[in-house]
Amino acid sequence: EEVCRMMQTATRIYDRTIVAVFKENRKALRDLVRESEDIYRDSRKLRAGLMPTLRRLKGAGLELSLYYIQMVDYLSEIAEALVHITRPTFEHIDNNHEGLSREQATDLMHINDDVAEIYGSINRILVTNDFSEIDSVLSMREDLFERIAATTKSELVRINEGEGNTKASILYLTILSETRTMVLQARNLLKAQRYFSEHADARMGRVRYTRNS
């Protein structure tokens, strides 16, 4: 439940950050930095509180404990990547640096749409515990990674040709890199959640069989 909540919050923060940087909305970005730092602290608290949870899972087998640790680690990586997007974005706008170019804004808009679709599918899977969409998520992730790679290459070409603003380019490339990290770790979290659920269901089946024998 906590993982689902934090993933949904991360989805909202990312989308609002991309919109706020388009509009150069300083106040919104300041609030989003605070929210992303809050979710990062929450993920670290989950990590710090692993031992009590692992003790509760002790009787459930080593595999469940391992997958739970992985889930918490991936969630922390997602939250950290989000901070690495919101913080420099706010600082860029707060320091009155030049905003993103039309090309950068257009590319980020498409990437934001892709991220929203991927995270929407992941959140739906986490809530319903129905993993039938997992191959579709993998396919969407690969398409997004190809888009990010092509977009990064285009930006490097523009930089080499002396086009655009250096600080805006650095911010743009940072957002692209951290977006890739966010999606990569979200997919990893989903895989860990699937294995966790499968082992939990298998163990519950064994427990029911033993009790009925």
Region roles according to the model:
Residues 1-213:
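Cytosolic, long alpha-helical scaffolding segments
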